[in-house]
């Protein structure tokens, strides 16, 4: 009995100690939460309803295969394009201290990119960057930076003038400072590439390899850019940089595979088809395919806009590194043989027109396989799996046997489709 009492006494002491420790932990956690809440309030950063809300493209005009048109009605040609599904348009707050808050994503941005810097300078500069009293800035991922792109811009590629008057960039200049490349400094007008922390994991040797996915807000594209000096060049390429802070969950998917061959992304609120179209088609056919599709009990499928489509890219996967498309393996991607004779994966259409100086003849796509170009006499992955470029909406791809543009981008026209719908 004495032993039992002694043990009971020990248990009581331990229990009291545990209660004190537990209470201290709870109080500490509450205090920590209060500090976090106080910090969030001080930062005035909104908490998004979904951690990875896709910001709209700001594409308000409709297009046919070549030009702007009046908005088509249900059942008419070219119905189903981006401008007819216009949601979550950008909303920013200028904090008047050199920072911009994105009210949709919960991210805070540097307003003015300042001078260009090398990639190493961009990476190393984040830890010492201090703006408006905040020191937790980071170099954005490609998905964070792409949240800023808008497709009310006009691609000036091929423009030979030096004046930027009348040109429209692919970023909201009501809030962000922006400048085109300066031809007087031996730069192209379109040399306005912005750096990210996202590197290409593929097998590209373009520019000596080691590509970084950057956003060009002058011409409205994602491409892989060499992080160091190009072969034969004394210096590496330089980039603009917009550091970011807040919402560290932005760009992280939460895929759930449903039992009906659909995939729900709980981070974005979008549902996708597990399988793609299985065959390529031109842009108008892609719109018709999406609008006419009834699948898994749903009839509200559509062609995704380019920012929705980019949201499901997995930049840690590629044909060269994982022997797969740049997408979570929960999805199925049709295998193709590319222009260079390699096993590869398709380009996928979006409903977003990529307007240029010749109006609306191109639409934006994402390359879930190698972003091929004909460069220095051979087909190679010039921009990396996950690049966003554009193709003519209609035509014969054989008219571009060596691609198009400075890096000879492969023109296919008959691209694949993956359908999307809103969960709610």
Regions found by a protein language model. Give the residues of each.
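N-terminal secretory signal peptides that target proteins for export/translocation
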Residues: 1-11
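Compositionally biased, intrinsically disordered low-complexity regions
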Residues: 7, 19, 60-63
């Amino acid at each position: 009995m004495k032993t039992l009492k002694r043990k009971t006494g020990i248990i009581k002491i331990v229990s009291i100690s545990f209660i004190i420790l537990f209470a201290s932990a709870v109080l500490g956690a509450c205090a920590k939460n209060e500090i976090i809440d106080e910090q969030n309030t001080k930062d005035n950063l909104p908490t998004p309803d979904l951690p990875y809300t896709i910001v709209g493209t700001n594409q308000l005009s409709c297009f046919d295969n070549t030009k702007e048109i009046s908005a088509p009605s249900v059942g008419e040609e070219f119905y189903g394009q981006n401008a007819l599904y216009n949601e979550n348009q950008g909303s920013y707050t200028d904090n008047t201290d050199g920072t911009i808050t994105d009210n949709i994503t919960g991210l805070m941005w540097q307003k003015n990119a300042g001078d260009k810097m090398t990639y190493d300078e961009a990476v190393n500069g984040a830890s010492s960057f201090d703006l408006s009293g905040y020191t937790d800035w980071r170099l954005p991922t490609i998905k964070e930076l792409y949240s800023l792109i808008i497709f009310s811009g006009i691609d000036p590629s091929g423009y030979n003038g030096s004046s930027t008057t009348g040109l429209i960039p692919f970023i909201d200049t009501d809030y962000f400072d922006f400048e085109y490349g300066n031809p007087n400094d031996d730069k192209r007008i379109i040399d306005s590439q912005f750096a990210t922390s996202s590197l290409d994991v593929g097998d590209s040797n373009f520019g000596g390899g080691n590509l970084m996915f950057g956003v060009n807000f002058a011409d409205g594209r994602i491409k892989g850019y060499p992080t160091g000096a190009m072969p034969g060049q004394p210096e590496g390429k330089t980039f603009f940089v917009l550091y970011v802070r807040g919402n560290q969950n932005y760009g992280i998917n939460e895929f759930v595979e449903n039992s009906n061959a659909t995939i729900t992304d709980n981070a974005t609120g979008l549902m996708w088809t597990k399988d793609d179209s299985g065959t390529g088609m031109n842009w108008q056919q892609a719109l018709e395919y999406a609008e006419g599709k009834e699948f898994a009990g749903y009839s509200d499928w559509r062609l995704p806009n380019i920012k929705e489509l980019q949201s499901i890219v997995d930049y840690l996967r590629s044909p060269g590194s994982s022997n797969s498309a740049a997408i979570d393996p929960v999805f199925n991607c049709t295998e193709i043989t590319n222009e260079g004779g390699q096993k590869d994966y398709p380009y996928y259409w979006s409903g977003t027109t990529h307007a240029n100086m010749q109006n609306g003849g191109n639409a934006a796509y994402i390359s879930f396989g190698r972003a091929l170009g004909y460069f220095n006499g051979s087909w190679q992955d010039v921009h990396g799996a996950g690049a966003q470029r554009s193709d003519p909406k209609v035509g014969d791809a054989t008219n571009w046997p060596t691609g198009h543009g400075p890096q000879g981008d492969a023109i296919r026209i008959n691209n694949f489709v993956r359908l999307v719908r809103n969960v709610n």
